[in-house]
Regions:
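Short Pro-Cys-Gly-centered "Cys-loop" motif that presents a nucleophilic cysteine in a tight turn
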Residues: 1-12, 18-51, 56, 65-188
Length: 188
């Protein structure tokens, strides 16, 4: 196993992501997405604060405040458990993920804010939906009050706005130049 270049240190924010081996799917049906979210709760209860997330057919994104010292081990256990389950369910063999998960330390609040937009707009960028709120497997619906959730803690971000509608406006106001601020923090 290769050594992680970004050490995960409790008390910091990270963009955590990974994709399918050879960019193949990691989620094949609705139940897979829900199962993965249940696994997140199982492996990371009291170990992280989930700021936002998005599960895409062939990759995932989490923006987290890490609270534990054994995050990498927990993430490895989660990935292995999920991969074994998918391989068994679909009669597959081999790697599900393209190597170890990636982690980018978030350097400031502006990057944290803009990364939430990037993560929530991922299904739109991927042409899976026309509007971010139409994608079921992201935390955006919790952010704008369309769904009550227990996984994300949107107040970390929403407290920067007078009301969630301002956050909605922030999301839809995305311009290509906003990507420049965060490009070093996203999928390689």
């Amino acid at each position: 196993m290769t050594r992680r270049t970004t050490q995960i240190v409790a008390g910091n924010y990270y963009h955590i992501y990974n994709r399918g081996n050879q960019r193949d799917r990691i989620f094949f049906e609705r139940e897979n997405y829900l199962y993965f979210l249940r696994k997140i709760r199982q492996y990371f209860r009291d170990a992280v604060v989930v700021i936002c997330y998005c599960l895409m057919p062939n990759h995932f994104h989490f923006l987290l405040l890490v609270l534990c010292d054994d995050f990498s081990r927990r993430m490895q256990n989660l990935s292995n458990s999920y991969a074994k389950s998918i391989n068994k369910r679909y009669n597959r063999v081999g790697h599900l993920f393209q190597g170890n998960f990636k982690a980018k330390l978030i350097s400031n609040d502006a990057v944290l804010l803009h990364l939430t937009r990037y993560i929530h707009l991922n299904p739109v960028f991927g042409k899976l939906v026309r509007r971010a709120e139409d994608w079921e497997f992201s935390s955006y619906r919790e952010y704008i009050g369309l769904r009550k959730g227990t996984l994300p803690e949107p107040d970390v971000i929403l407290d920067q706005f007078k009301e969630f509608r301002e956050y909605q406006e922030f999301i839809v106001s995305y311009q290509e130049e906003h990507f420049e601020m965060i490009k070093e923090y996203v999928l390689e």
